[in-house]
Amino acid sequence: METAHAPVLAPGALPLLGHALALSAPLRFLRSLPAHGDLVEVRVGPLRAVVVCDPALTHQVLLNDRVFDKGGLVLKRGREIAGNGLGTCAHRDHRRQRRLVQPAFHRHRMPHYASVMVRQASEVMNAWRPGQIIDVLDEMGTVSIRSIAAAVSAALPPGRADSLIADYFSLEQVLYRRMLTPPPFDRLPTPGKRRYDRARARLQQTVQEIIAVHREGKPDRGDLMSMLLLARVAPSDTDDGRRLSDREVSDQIVSFFLAGAKTVAETLSWSAHLVATHPEVRQRLHAEVDTVMSASVPLYGDLHRLKTTENIVKETLRLYPAAALTRTTTTATELGRYRLRAGTTVVYSPYLLHRHPGLFPDPEHFRPERWLSIPAADARAVYLPFAAGPRKCIGDTFGFMECTLVLAMLAARWQLEPVGDSDSSPVFGATLRPRRLRMRLIARTGTEDEPPASPA
């Protein structure tokens, strides 16, 4: 039997700094690591992490959440905002929370959520005008956070939705920098830290107010908040079936806002960029939406026929998924032929996996048609935009549906044209966003207001 050994240290580590200088070009550094081994150690100052570069070992990490629990700097910063929500809680709390939250994302709820998404996207797009230059990420962020806010609570006043949008952007701008700021420097009262603290407090206060309104009114308003407040499961050997507390409900909602809005906004922005820069794909997309949709507003019932749109979203998520996510070992263990101590930060990268030439031929190129020939079972093994295993994103269907519906609506109404000062280079964080994506709107149809879509 082969003896387990420690992961190899990535080359270029400097005294005290570790790989901090190499990480000034983070994606280049990340993509250099597989050449050095299946597990590679990275250091930044006093921080240590092991990056998993092998697909099979990545799946072992994701499937065994008891040993490879949620943890690391990404999760530490996430917990500052989202507390002990489903996306940030430890293994010991996860099963109970998952059982309680799951009904809110049952497939029979999706038609209602779809109508909410389409209505919110229509309101944003109805304000656009031909020839206008938009910041695509800002606009898609507005669509996404408004959609989540409306899906969460039918009782949310419009002014509160606007404040949620502002607070979301404030938190998103600072969060990645805080992930890489070691203690005690993360507690210094810098202007960014003060903005972060104020936005975090306002967001949590808004969610508490929404909960209070729901507690006082009718128990089921048909929204996600109602489902969480009413959720209860039968007692089992591992939990007593208690409802979610108000604090737990608040943590879930804040998690949905932060994780869901960011992922959807960035995916839609990258999709718009990729469609605009690939004319043959744009032509196929326009032909599909013109054929499938009776108006410029898609319906839930159109989804199964929007295959080109769906494949564009899939391919976008392949090229621009999460860059680096973390787990922490709860005990000493072995991963493949490597030994890991308890408390080791383990980094896995959907970005690395999705650009592996042995898994995806011609991996650097945008080819939505590749998904016509990839069996679903094969995709599940190598395609991880929403992770995998027990901690797979609970909102994967919700988020993918929103991306598909909004992209279809965008393509039906507008053609987007990049402008000169646009910069589509990816900015590294837990996820990847375009640096500056400005595009000119060219109308394909009239821009008059569309009626709200029904959930049919």
Label for each model-derived stretch:
Residues 14-37, 205, 209, 296-336, ...:
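Conserved cytochrome P450 K-helix E-x-x-R motif and the immediately C-terminal K′/meander segment
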Residues 6-13, 114, 118, 166-170, ...:
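Cytochrome P450 I-helix active-site segment
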Residues 1-96, 111, 115-123, 158-159, ...:
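N-terminal membrane-proximal hinge/A-helix region immediately C-terminal to the signal-anchor transmembrane segment
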